[in-house]
């Protein structure tokens, strides 16, 4: 599937982290708020980042949709996410300016939808997921500095 978009729901929601991972300034990339339905975001045991798993009836997850990613960006993202994650296509709901969950208010035109890639936690690693929801606010307040210190050296470009 030829997509140049990626929905970030964890550490990659922060453009400075996405810049480090992609190895180039991503401020030129268009990024907007988006929501993913039918999935849950759980903390990974012993880590500051989350794992995403399908879950029917789950509350919509807010994240960031990056547009304009290159094949080289995806090579680096694939290497960064590693064996615990698989890149899969999903559909996200783009931000509707009148709401906080991306859905259109009654009587308004429906919010736009977009097909995109997301990195989902592989089923064989789900035993590492903790119960509860991963908190972006807690990550920013407590985990981001630790995460950046741990992964600041990520500069490898995988072989083609």
Please name every model-derived segment.
Residues 1-160:
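Glycine-aromatic micro-motifs
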């Amino acid at each position: 599937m030829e997509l140049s978009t990626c929905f970030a729901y964890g550490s990659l929601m922060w453009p400075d982290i996405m810049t480090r991972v992609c190895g180039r300034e991503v401020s030129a990339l268009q990024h907007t708020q988006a929501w993913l339905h039918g999935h849950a975001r759980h903390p990974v045991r012993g880590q500051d980042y989350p794992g995403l798993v399908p879950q029917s009836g789950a509350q919509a997850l807010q994240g960031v949709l990056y547009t304009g990613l290159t094949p080289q960006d995806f090579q680096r993202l694939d290497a960064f996410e590693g064996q615990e994650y698989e890149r899969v296509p999903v559909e996200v709901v783009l931000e509707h300016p009148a709401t906080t969950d991306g859905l259109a208010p009654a009587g308004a035109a429906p919010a736009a939808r977009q097909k995109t890639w997301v990195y989902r936690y592989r089923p064989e690693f789900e035993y590492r997921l903790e119960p509860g929801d991963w908190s972006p606010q807690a990550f920013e307040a407590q985990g981001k500095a630790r995460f950046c210190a741990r992964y600041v050296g990520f500069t490898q470009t995988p072989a083609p």
